Amino acid sequence: VITRSYGSGSPVTLVAHGLGATPGEARIPASGLPGTRVVVTLPSHGDAPDAPEGYWDYGRIAADLGTVLADQAVGVSLGAGALVRLLSVEPDRFARVALLLPAVLDQRHGSFTLQQLSDLTVGPPIYVAERRAALARLAAAAGQLPGQVAVPDASVLAAVSAPVLVIGAVGDPLHPEDVAKATAAAFPNGELWLIDSPAPMITHRTEVRHRLVSFFAG
């Protein structure tokens, strides 16, 4: 993986993007947070090399995220699932965690195609073009990730004492609200915010940014 740091000082926030995120999109969740934001670029994204064969496994991605020293973390979709896996093996790893649009917890879900991801992309034409170009590198991920779970048994997350904010969408077939609800419920200090939009990172970007700033401020 590649990491890039923005800002300076503490706290240090790890930022883990979703599948097919463009470089600019990957930075969005942490914009406005104080301290240092360390944005991870996973293989086959941005200027990172293509993923090695068999890479797309939540455990392997979690291990890569675990190499970044940080006080707190934000993950989106695939990144959220990898953070959940990391917390399952290191429950005291972070002081606070935000999980945006989790796609899976401990129950398997149906497959998805890159065409589905492309068709669900909305926004300005330049962004849509960048997103579709990013997805073109991810055929292996689309073949390997469906059927996987973030954790085999969500009950292990009861060992996580840190506050965890889960932000879910309503009407997003790839990020079901039931998964967001189950994820928030799995953490003793979990908090759920369901946004009535299938694409809250676009329709409610300002509100999400303000909520994250407030959450990490404690």
Which residues make up each language-model segment?
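Short beta-strand/loop motif that positions the catalytic acidic residue
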Residues: 160, 166-168
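Hydrophobic, aromatic-rich cap/lid helix
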Residues: 127-155, 171
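Conserved HGGG/HGGXW glycine-rich cap/lid loop of the alpha/beta-hydrolase fold
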Residues: 2-49
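Conserved alpha/beta-hydrolase "acid-adjacent" motif
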Residues: 173-179
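Catalytic active-site module of serine/aspartate enzymes centered on a nucleophile-bearing elbow/loop
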Residues: 190-218
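Conserved alpha/beta-hydrolase "nucleophile elbow" surrounding the catalytic nucleophile
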Residues: 17, 71, 75-80, 169
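Active-site loop/oxyanion-hole signature of alpha/beta-hydrolase fold enzymes
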Residues: 39-72
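Flexible "cap/lid" loop of the alpha/beta hydrolase fold
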Residues: 81-123
